[in-house]
Structure formats: structure tokens, C-alpha cells
Amino acid sequence: MTLLTSSLLLFSLLTSRLEAIPVLEKSPAHPAHSAHPAHPSHPSPGVRILRAPESLVAPLGDEVVLECETSLQPERFEWSHRSSRSQGAGFKYLRTGTAKANVSQEAAISRLRVLVREDTLGEYRCVGWFGPLVVTSTIARLELASTSLVGAQESESPLQWRVAAGNSVLWSCGQQVQSNPSASWSYYRNGVEIKPEFIGTNGNLILSNVSSESSGSYSCQATNPASGERIQLPGLLQLQVTPEQRSLSKSPHLLKGQPSSQEITIREGSSLLLLCPGVGSPPPTVVWSSPDVVGAVKNKRSKVFGHALEISDTRVQDAGTYICFQDNGVRPALEHYIKVHVEQPPQIVRPPWADLTNEGDRLKLECEATGVPSPEIYWLLNGHSSIDDTEAELSNNFLILHSVLKRHAGYVQCFARNRLGEHSAGTLLQVNPKQIQEPRESGGTHRPKPNQGSKQKQMYPPSPPNVTRLSDESVMLRWMVPRNDGLPIVIFKVQYRMVGKRKNWQTTNDNIPYGKPKWNSELGKSFTASVTDLKPQHTYRFRILAVYSNNDNKESNTSAKFYLQPGAALDPMPVPELLEIEEYSETAVVLHWSLASDADEHLITGYYAYYRPSSSAGEYFKATIEGAHARSFKIAPLETATMYEFKLQSFSAVSASEFSALKQGRTQRPKTSTTEEPTLQMGDRDTTTPSHNETFNMSPMLTGTLGGGAVLTLLLISICLCVCRRRSSRSRGNNPNKPRMAELRDDFVPLGNCSPTKQRQRTRHIHITLNPLAQQQQGMEEKNDTDQDAPYYQRPSSYDYDPGLRRMSSSSLRRSQRTLERAGGSNGSNNGNNNNLNQSTETGPVENPGKPGRVLMKRPRLSSRSENLSSGSLNSVGV
């Protein structure tokens, strides 16, 4: 059955239409359907400022609190200050616990309490220390609350306006007030406060559709919301409203003191209110338009209220000139122009990015930002200004380090700044230090030995590991061995210790093999390993121990201090979704995945890929994928034509995400070539995978014919072998002169022939005991057994004289004879128990003229072949 099934499968395979599978040269970097920026995702240290201190305006003598929060609890917080009285001075770290500044810390939140004085005004920064990493917040300004009049005369005479009923009157009473923060306004008519129709007019009072009841004396008052200071403006408005019927026709015109044009500056995201001054008789109709802004009036964010145009959620594209056109049928019409400027806080759109950099190399970092006015770009290296660094050069939006030094390793931050605020972005700069040759112990010149090379290979240590939290009790380490020509590394060991006094280094039990001596990137070869059984809410350091081919070892530099944060206190990381497992080759697959939102990429440093054969329940193999923009990755080497299961998780230095759903995929099946590949004479060529022209170049019809003929030939040969073996077995069984020993052995040989399954047969020890006295009964048993021989696998018994019996000792013959005589003397019958066959035997006297008095024991016949197989000791005959 097995042979037939295999033959049919081979026949179907050979007769199917086979085409060569093209060989892929390189794994695609990204799926085709996704868009990617010009540079990979910037490596993030995993720690960042979640909440920077905010700018405040307060009066003298008041106490303010500045708050700063980081994503992970730092080792310590510090605050720096730059006074507003010293122009051009740098930031200085504050001494805490003084009368004018006090710092308190609660987990990952730091609070700075400042007493507002002339010397405490200025700019403040929050600085978080995470081992060698320094993360700096954006600037918070502390300013003094103030309100003042600009160019106003206390003896200013009031305005006298006379208008026809039905007009809209605009009075700008707040043009002479300067307030920080912006003042709130109150309006009065005849000494009684009135509620304005529009709020947020910045000191402009608009009276729509005035009537005789609107006549009166108007005044206004400005209040500073921070200090509560109030200023009563000296200017007054005397308004007189006449009935429309009594007014003469007059074209639209401006009243005394009304501006002919306006220029307004507003912050992006605020609400903008444009007011159109002018009156006429009859009251004019107002039409709004803009030659610079398409759809400025007819959109969901704009509303027209006669002489007012309100634009909510102002955007940069709303900047431009707006025209208020007034017409009442009397020429000329009136046009009023309003110039709108929209300011935008700075926003970094292209953050800096840095990879592992060798010490002494040149590094160029770019930082691109938007904002109105155009923001100023400056850089901090681990909290220190790049201006003070002798190796740094600033060129437009670029930071150039002519020679990267060890002190540059850490966090590099780019800041974009304009008068509306600041925005920052950073990257982790890892510096691969130069390898320093160890000096020889003995001084003077060293003459090499005859058998010793002129240059001895060095032991290059691995880089210090980067640490990522996996769970409350485990972390993942990532390190790299830089490209070198030193001694090969055999295995790695991971060591860790808890930070504190008298804490020793612990070594994990796992040996991490180096693998093939092959660099998997331009910088070197990267590795990963996990460390378990750690304690949460404790700080650890890690290092890597490399064991070399000379059985010596060398340690890496220790990692930065890592605080193992409990998972409940961390925000969840975005979980990638495995989309497809592409069969890349016989030994490789390509994973394709996606994120729920590309906006989450700034939270991710890279991905961990886990895989193992689907038939295995062992531990997963791990692979590290650097860069948040990656959407595919090739995993190799794998077993040929093997099903694997895969899962992914994203990670940062703080934590790792939950695992994605398991997805299975297999490697390609082996490609069988029907042509022999010629031997290469010159050059290097990859012969592991046949090319398109070399694979299956025979036609499908010819291939099918040859395959079918081969299968039929195999079937005929198998049938002939089985028939011949069965005939030879029968011919041997019919030979009456065959020795008894050979007959018993042949009885059980056919059990292994023509077996339907190739199961492993259990080896049994054969114990055969011949009855030397049973030969005289040969004729009688042949007569009784001949008719029933076919249904049984046991051959007919033959007791012919065998010359081999002469070799049996006379003592054994006499013992056997006495046993039979005793059995025959017990009333001529006895039911003996055969322990091997578990069947009864019959004994009795048999008359034999040649040998009187001889008692023979008749051997029982087995009922079936299956009973023979289940006996367990078929080749033992009890006498």
C-alpha cells in the first residue's frame, strides 16, 4: 500500500506542469502600498519629556509652580535658569532649597516652586538624568504681569458721532492699552455695564442695528487677568442715533477716529473676528471677500454677521488680505482692507537621526522645522549647547560633528524656537570606541619567533548592550560586534547586577553562540538575548562577556543604569499586525506587517521577531529589526520545506508591546533540476539555487511519459519479487527431507516478506527444543496434517531421521524418554500445560512394531496465523 501511494504521488508530481521559480536577489525594504520618508526612523532612547513646563505670567511677590514629567522615572531631576536681565547669558543650574526656588520630586514628576521677583524672571528648563543620557525639556518663560497705556492723553476729548438708525457702529476703545497677558474688557453706557454682542474683540465694541435707545455716553475698562489690575480708559464716545426717515441719503463712509485699514496678527488655532467700520444712509449692505484666500468666506469655519466675519480654528492658509465692501446704492461704495497674519508655533517635521557611529568619524545631522515666523534651530548634546563644542559646526539646519568623540555618546536634541514657543526632537547617538592595542608587558623591541606571525590578532569586545523591558521580570539585550579582523568569538555570556553596595555580577546559564562568521550589516553583527528572573522597581546594569577561540574572554562596557518599571505604570506600545509570510527561498521567508497608525512610529525603536518550527514546542528563535519604519524583514537560515510559526512585537528602550497574533508560513520546497549543471571553471558563482534556464528545461509531456514508465516498471518488479518469494517458500515447505531445525526457521521467515508497512519488527530470541523421540511418528502426523496445512502458517511436521541428532548427548535422550514414560503411565492420558503455546497436549501409547513400548507426544496445531503472532514464543516447543 505504501509503495503504491508513493508511486502515485511521484507520478502526479512528474506529470504536472512545472515552471522555474525566479530567484529573488534582495528582500524588499518596504511594502509597495506604503509611503515612507526619506530616512529611517530615528532611534529613540525610550525616555522623553511627557509634559514640559509651561510659560507663566504672574505679578511680583506671587509664587508659581513649574511642572515637568518624564516617561520614566529618572535618577534625578535638575532645573536650569536664564535670567531675563542678563542678555546673551547661558543657562545655569539652580541650587534647590533656597528662598527663591524649591524643587520637589514625586516618581517621574518634578515641581519647581519659584517666588516671582525681578531676578527670578526669565527662562527655565527641566533636565532629567538617565545614567549617561540627559533629556532636556523645552523652555518655559516666567514673565511679569503688566498693563499700561500707550500714547494716551488723559485730557483727550470725547468722540461725537451722529448716525442714522439701522447702522452698525464699531468703536475701538482699546487701541491704547498694552497688557500681558491680554486684558479682558468691560463696556459701559451712561455708567451702566452692558454685555457686548461679540466676545474677544480685543477692545472693539460693535453695536449692531442701532436705534434711538442706543444713544448715550460710552466708556470702557481693561482688566489684567493675572494681576487683577484695572485701567479706566479716558476716551469717551458720545453717540446720537437719528431716525432713518429724517436722515439725508449719504454714501457709506467712516466716522471720526475709525481706521481706514487694519492689520491683525493671530495665533494658529485661535478664533479670528474681523470687523468692518462704516455707516451710511440708508444703512449699507456688507459683502466680504479675499483675493488671497480661496473660499475664505464660504467654508465651514467662517460665519458672517453683517459687519463682522468670524473664522474659527484659524490656519496658516487663512493669512492674507480681506476686503469689506459696503454699498447702499449711493455712490461711491466703500472698501475696507484688513491684513491678517497667522503665526504658527514651531514644529519639527524632520527630526535628526543617528546610527551607531565609529569614534573619529564625521557625522552630519539634519533637523527641519516649520513655523511662522521661521524658527531658529539650535542643538544640545547631552544637555550642553553645541556652540561650546569644538568639534561641532552649525550650518543652516545641520549639525556637523567633524570628529565624533566618546563624550558625544548619549542624547542629541534639536530645538526649533520662535516667539510663540519651542519644539524639540532627539536621537540616540551611539559611539563605537576605537580599539586600543594593549601594550606589551616587556619593554624594548620585540623580535617575533620564527613560527609566530608579525601581527597577533586582538580580542575586540562587543558593544555595551541596549536594554529593553519585556515584562515586569525580564528584559531584552541588544549588542553588536563591530567589523574587525581580530580573534573569532565562539560564544557570549550575559552578566548583570543590581545597582547598590556589595552587589555582585550574576552570569546567566545560557551560552549564546556567535553563529556563522559573517557580518550581517555594514557596521558588524548584532545579537539579542533575554534576561529573566529580575525584580521590578529595581535598577540594573548589564554587560556582555565574549569568549574567543583561544579560550580567553573579554567584557564589554557596562550598559547604562536601567530601572525596571512595572508594566502597570507604562503606556501600552503599539502592536504590529502580521500581514503575510512570503516564501522567499528554500531557507528563508519574508515577514510583512503593518501598524494600526503610522503616527505611532515615534514611540517605536524597532521590532522583535520570534519564530520556531510549528512541530516544535521549544523556545522561539529571536531576530531584531531596527527602525520604526520597517514593514518587512527576511529571516534566514531556515529548514527547507518546513512550516514555521511567527509573531512580532514592537519595542523601545522603555518597554515592549504585546505579541501579535501567531501566523504560520513555510519555506519553499527543494527545486529539482533535470539537467546537470556544468562545472564552473573561473570566478565565483552561487550554485545553491538553479537559475531560470537551468531548472526543469524538459517539456512536460516528455517528463510525464518518463515518470509514468518508471512507476509501472517499479510496480511490475515488486509483483514479480513477491510471487517468486512465495513460490520458493512453498517449494521449501514440500521437501520431506528438510531438517527440522531449518523447517521451523523457515516457518516464520515469510512473516517479513511482502509486508504492507515498513514498520520496525521487534527482534525476538528463538529457542527451539527438538524431540528426538518423535521421529517415529512422522508418517502418522504427515497423514493427519496434510489436509489442513494450507490455512496455517505452521508447516507440516516432519520427523525424518536427522543426522544432527547423533550429536545430542545420551543423557538428554534418556531424560526425555523417562519423562514420556511417566506421562504415559498415568492412566494413559494427561493434560499437560504448554507454557509457550497455552494449549493442551494429548499423550498415549502408540503401537509401533519397530519400537515397542515407545510413548509419543502429539504436538497441537495452532488455530490461525494471528494466534501464532500473538503467542510471543512461537519458536519454542515444550516437551
Swiss-Prot record:
Signal peptide: 1-20
GO cellular component, one term: membrane
PROSITE patterns, per the entry: FN3, IG_LIKE
Keyword field contains Transmembrane helix: yes
Family of the protein in this entry: Belongs to the immunoglobulin superfamily. IHOG family.
Domain (Ig-like C2-type) ranges: 45-142, 132-232, 252-340, 346-432
Polar residues biased stretches: 665-678, 688-698
Sites carrying sugar chains: 102, 209, 466, 557, 693
Lineage start: Eukaryota, Metazoa, Ecdysozoa, Arthropoda, Hexapoda
Subunit relationships: Homodimer. Heterotetramer; 2 iHog chains bind 2 hh chains when facilitated by heparin, heparin is required to promote high-affinity interactions between hh and iHog.
Region of interest (Disordered), residue spans: 426-467, 662-698, 728-879
Domain Fibronectin type-III, first and last residues per copy: 461-567, 575-670
One GO term of the biological process aspect: wing disc anterior/posterior pattern formation
GO molecular function, one term: coreceptor activity
Disulfide pattern: 68-126, 173-220, 276-324, 367-414
Keywords recorded for this protein, A-Z: Disulfide bond, Glycoprotein, Heparin-binding, Immunoglobulin domain, Membrane, Proteoglycan, Repeat, Signal, Transmembrane, Transmembrane helix
Protein name: Interference hedgehog
Cytoplasmic side: 725-879
Function: Mediates response to the active Hedgehog (Hh) protein signal in embryos, functioning upstream or at the level of patched (ptc).
CDD domains on file: FN3
Membrane topology, as annotated: Single-pass type I membrane protein
Compartment(s) of residence: Membrane
Keyword Flavoprotein belongs to the record: no
Ranges of compositional bias, category Low complexity: 822-836, 863-879
